[in-house]
Amino acid sequence: MPPTPCSLCHTARALVKRPKTGQQVCKDCFFEVFETEVHNTIVEGEGIFKRGERVAIGASGGKDSTVLAHVLSVLNKRYDYGLDLYLLSIDEGITGYRDDSLETVKQNQAEYGLPLKILSYSELYGWTMDKIVEQVGKKNNCTFCGVFRRQALDRGAAQLGVDHIVTGHNADDIAETVLMNIMRGDIARLARCTAVTTQSEDTIKRSKPFKYAYEKEIVMYAYFKKLTYFSTECIYSPDAYRGHARVFLKDLEAVRPSAIVDIIHSGESFVLEQSVQRGMKALQTCLRCGYISSNDLCKACALLEGLESGLSRSALRQTQESTSAAPEGHRTIPMFERYASLNGTPRTPPTPAEPVEGIERAVRTIEIV
């Protein structure tokens, strides 16, 4: 039986069957359509980027952020976006996981020549995820990590003096988030979670260039490009609530491959009525650390106070409404400062992080099986 020709160029042998479209394409055509689709997501409407922006790529060393760093570097040169790109990594303090994945980030930094900033939970909060799990257990530890990580990214971006954070959230991730918000009845977040770009007047802009990129295609891109990335799942994630949505989504995808994009489009169609929007809490600044919050005390400060007090997960909610200074002897989060002004006129940023030299450990790679 003769080999199947590429459905796009009709000359080379097809090596990839795209999960999203079912097209059978050759390797070079796959690279072209994948990169073009990401570019189209970036420039659609008013566009994600503005020329001259300083953009931090949230880099974990995993497949999504590794491919994102590679593709953005390529597209920035090909289409002359005029961006200053940086790598921003958060060290949650998970032994045997994050310490190894950061070595992959360092290799990516050396390969692409991008400045790298690493900010740790230990440095910022005085706690590592290993210590947090020791105290609260594995059942709800992702709540802590999600809250702490989001604030750490904003603080790292402020230290770099960047205008914009991009993350490797892919179509599967976004569809899972839509399902989670439906299952939790969180209507307010449904439309927001599907947006390519989110920003309020008090927050650093965040974007998801891989909004329509399927996870399987990201893996195939990394494989055929021979990109090095860290493949191990977080050791604390098997008990995460997101896992249930992921299993359900994979079952749907097996029956209907378009289910992922269909769910995203469903989330996009949710629009809150004005009466509901008016009833939502306005954003303010945390009285303790100065970070953005819908309460007098931000979630990170509330969770940290609970940890410092030795509270169990069930008792941590009691600290949410606290407005007083932290109890004596408790560690607190440093005051949050933006280095780029909110009105578009940048203040003088700190000196960007110096390139990281040397890779101390062997970097793991993954093969598609």
UniProtKB/Swiss-Prot annotation:
Protein name in the entry: Cytoplasmic tRNA 2-thiolation protein 1
Annotated function: Plays a central role in 2-thiolation of mcm(5)S(2)U at tRNA wobble positions of tRNA(Lys), tRNA(Glu) and tRNA(Gln). Directly binds tRNAs and probably acts by catalyzing adenylation of tRNAs, an intermediate required for 2-thiolation. It is unclear whether it acts as a sulfurtransferase that transfers sulfur from thiocarboxylated URM1 onto the uridine of tRNAs at wobble position. Prior mcm(5) tRNA modification by the elongator complex is required for 2-thiolation. May also be involved in protein urmylation.
Compartment(s) where it occurs, according to its Swiss-Prot or TrEMBL record: Cytoplasm
Principal subcellular localisation of the protein: cytoplasm
Pathway: tRNA modification; 5-methoxycarbonylmethyl-2-thiouridine-tRNA biosynthesis
HAMAP family documented for this protein: CTU1
GO biological process: protein urmylation; tRNA thio-modification; tRNA wobble position uridine thiolation; tRNA wobble uridine modification
First-tier enzyme category under EC: transferase
EC nos: 2.7.7.-
Keywords tagged on the record: Cytoplasm, RNA-binding, Transferase, tRNA processing, tRNA-binding
CC annotations in GO: cytosol; cytosolic tRNA wobble base thiouridylase complex; peroxisome
InterPro entries: CTU1-like_ATP-bd, CTU1_C, Ncs6/Tuc1/Ctu1, Rossmann-like_a/b/a_fold, TilS/TtcA_N, tRNA_thiolation_TtcA_Ctu1
Family: Belongs to the TtcA family. CTU1/NCS6/ATPBD3 subfamily.
GO molecular function: nucleotidyltransferase activity; tRNA binding; tRNA-uridine 2-sulfurtransferase activity
NCBIfam families: TIGR00269 family protein
Domain of life, source organism: Eukaryota
